[in-house]
A protein has these predicted regions:
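Dynamic helix-loop-helix/coil hinge segments at AAA+ ATPase domain boundaries and subdomain interfaces
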Residues: 4-26, 162
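Phosphate-binding P-loop
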Residues: 33-41
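Walker A/P-loop nucleotide-binding motif
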Residues: 40-57
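Conserved P-loop NTPase "ATPase switch" module shared by AAA+ and STAND
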Residues: 68-88, 92-95, 99-107
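Short regulatory helix/loop adjacent to the ATP-binding pocket of P-loop NTPases
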Residues: 111-125
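Conserved AAA+ ATPase "sensor/coupling" helix adjacent to the nucleotide-binding pocket
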Residues: 127, 142-154
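Conserved AAA+ ATPase "SRH/arginine-finger" region at the nucleotide-binding site
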Residues: 127-139
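C-terminal helical "lid" of AAA+/P-loop NTPase domains
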Residues: 161-165, 172-186
Length: 208
């Protein structure tokens, strides 16, 4: 059989709408309010494990704030900031507090649990602080099934189970794989099945 190089298209532009909330509904609502200028709290800090959606949410809020003309600053991976960068963020916080604006920051742990300057950690903890909980397997499965339905694709349970067991577990990768599987199904003129998925995964896949 002819080998095909299937391009798995880049994930959609991050938005609050295409973020699967799981147990993070309250955080999502607060971010929406802040990024549109409707929230009482202008300072939000998100923390959680890699793949929990922190960067997705920061980028989504940046875009939303631009649309609404809101002055918003984001700071990702604050646990990696150098001493000078921490001072800059501290000064930015104070400036936004005095002049108006929104700051949304994110890191791997709660502010007081990281090796940050005391003054910066205190500032970050003053606002709303949310731990982002990763999706459960059931929630990931629901998200994949919904994504498949949007494409008019009938997705067998065994395909979902295989994806969750053998692929990277972040949603962009999982959904991009489903998109490629849908294209491969049309190319091969075969229904979506587990054998077809295994065949797809034998091909060189471009996921960049």
């Amino acid at each position: 059989m002819k080998q095909l190089l299937l391009d798995i298209q880049p994930a959609p532009v991050p938005s609050l709408e295409n973020f699967v909330p799981g147990r993070n509904t309250e955080a999502l609502f607060s971010l929406l309010q802040a990024a549109t200028g409707k929230g009482e709290s202008r300072f939000i800090y998100l923390w959680g494990a890699a793949g929990s959606g922190k960067s997705h949410l920061l980028r989504a809020c940046e875009d939303l704030a631009r649309q609404h003309g809101i002055r918003l600053v984001t700071a990702d991976n604050v646990h990696r900031l150098s001493d000078d960068a921490q001072i800059d963020l501290f000064n930015t916080y104070n400036r936004l507090r005095e002049e108006g604006g929104v700051l949304i920051a994110a890191g791997e742990a709660a502010p007081m649990q990281m090796q940050l300057r005391d003054d910066l950690a205190t500032r970050l903890a003053w606002g709303l602080v949310y731990q982002l909980h990763p999706l459960s397997d059931a929630e990931r499965a629901q998200a994949l099934t919904a994504h498949a339905l949007e494409r008019g694709m009938k997705l067998p349970d065994e395909v979902v189970d295989y994806c969750l067991r053998h692929l990277r577990r972040d949603l962009p990768t999982l959904m991009a794989t489903l998109d490629a599987l849908d294209e491969w199904s049309l190319t091969a003129k075969r229904p979506v099945t587990l054998p077809l998925l295994r065949q797809l995964l034998q091909l060189p896949l471009n996921i960049d």
